[in-house]
Amino acid sequence: MSFTTISVIGLGYIGLPTAAAFASRQKQVIGVDINQHAVDIINRGEIHIVEPALGNVVKMAVEGGFLRATTTPVEADAYLIAVPTPFKGDHDPDMAYVEAAAKSIAPVLKKGALVILESTSPVGATEQMAGWLAGMRTDLTFPQQAGEQADVNIAYCPERVLPGQVMVELIKNDRVIGGMTPVCSARASALYKIFLEGECVVTNSRTAEMCKLTENSFRDVNIAFANELSLICAEQGINVWELIRLANRHPRVNILQPGPGVGGHCIAVDPWFIVAQNPQQARLIRTAREVNDGKPHWVVDQVKAAVTDCLAATDKRASEVKIACFGLAFKPNIDDLRESPAMGIAQSIARWHSGETLVVEPNIRQLPKKLDGLCTLAKLDAALAAADVLVMLVDHDEFKAIPGDAVHQRYVVDTKGVWR
């Protein structure tokens, strides 16, 4: 069965680019999102997120009649579910969004449909989703019931793209295809090949789920090494960035760069999915998470020390000292604030500090709710002119262009080594 109509459930940082990629190949794409504001923006041919090159693709797709957004699922040949999968307070995976998405498409499923879960999920999530669908559509058969002969095919195909490069990597990167049966994998591969230039690498759904978790856990462990090294170097009076530069001259050493912690909806979340299912075995993965989650607390302590130094060297009261935090996003040059350590650091500073806390984030127009009323969103030049203590949290291009003489006479906490 060919794919004439494709529906993408969830029009966020992954879902919207995916929908746009299919629409750019002149497929009829229906994007579904519960956010009416996002739906309205997309239907105007605009985008509600910051992602280079995405805006033009969406504009052309909407104007060409190949992409439309709605809040209610409709009948389609294929469904891709790209909704959030956060963790609960105890670090257990929260599959509520996936369950809601599955139940929303169940009434419009037809024989021959393909359902793909893209959301990063714990091992077994695809089988669980198939169970939810089967429970709601007893008139159809699913892979766990009928194998290769199932009426509905189901697969797990994780995204593996870099924010800021999504429209390139979505097309160029290889794709892991984890069907519940070989037929499911074959159909999922055929769907992605509509726009994919990379290779479709086929496996089963459980291995595909674990592959995504493994990729992000590997990165988290390596970042934890760099972050722990930065703590050690601070105690020893060593420039960690110079140290890493020298160590990386070894042909078999490639240490990553330290920072204020780890953010985003993948690396800061996914390792916990492994830990939750394998608490006795995943000791290194758990420790890496604890190291990276602890780094923001260390940064706040450095800011407190800088304020103390400022007070000792000036005649200002604490309430007169202004602190400027540079960056809120979880990585450079994007507007995505999910799980960003910079957000928590700015919030902690503002709650502790009796003076004004300025925030500079060139990729947003207003402060998120958790900072509204605590901080002041400021322009770059104004913050540089007013602040006594500068806190570098995200190495946006605008910040890397700041001349050294603009910061060298200040009290500086540089978590990214931009002003070293």
Swiss-Prot record:
Its EC number is 1.1.1.336. SMART domains: UDPG_MGDP_dh_C. NAD(+) binds at Y13, I14, D33, T85, T126, R338. Keywords: NAD, Oxidoreductase. Pathway: Bacterial outer membrane biogenesis; enterobacterial common antigen biosynthesis. The active site is at K212 (proton donor/acceptor), C266 (nucleophile). One of its GO terms (biological process) is enterobacterial common antigen biosynthetic process. It catalyses: UDP-N-acetyl-alpha-D-mannosamine + 2 NAD(+) + H2O = UDP-N-acetyl-alpha-D-mannosaminouronate + 2 NADH + 3 H(+). Catalyzes the four-electron oxidation of UDP-N-acetyl-D-mannosamine (UDP-ManNAc), reducing NAD(+) and releasing UDP-N-acetylmannosaminuronic acid (UDP-ManNAcA). Homodimer. NCBIfam families: NDP-sugDHase (TIGR03026), PRK11064.1 (NF008286). This is UDP-N-acetyl-D-mannosamine dehydrogenase. It comes from Salmonella typhimurium (strain LT2 / SGSC1412 / ATCC 700720).
